[in-house]
Amino acid sequence: LDPNGIFLFDLKTDHYFKSIGCQSFCDADEEVSFIWDNDYDEEKRINSYALTLFVQEEDNRYERFDEYHEQRAFSIDEVRCAIEESGMIFLSAIDKNGAPATKDTDRVYIIAREKGKTPLQNL
């Protein structure tokens, strides 16, 4: 990282995955349509989803694309420990509005920096 740089990333939370649960979602317009089948294992904190996309080609045919994804929910404490174990400093966990993340936050933004680097100024 740059001497004054930060490491910023986001992650979806257990709260978010529980809220979408085991549901299916779909949407369609002229250029693309999708079907999203979601499954959340609360015990393992693993969210699995199958996504099928239909994308309109130039000749007006629709090409099908299938994807499968898995995401794990990590607590802020787990992320903090991983950051500190990597030799970085955990600065904060915030929501989309910049407020401290809570148990009801859907997406958490994590801010960290390298140890020994100059603290952020004029942020």
Identify the function of each model-found stretch.
Residues 5, 32, 88-89:
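A structural micro-motif
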Residues 8-77:
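SAM-dependent methyltransferase
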Residues 1-7:
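Short glycine-dipeptide loop
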Residues 70-123:
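C-terminal lobe and adjacent flexible extensions of AdoMet/dcAdoMet transferase-like proteins
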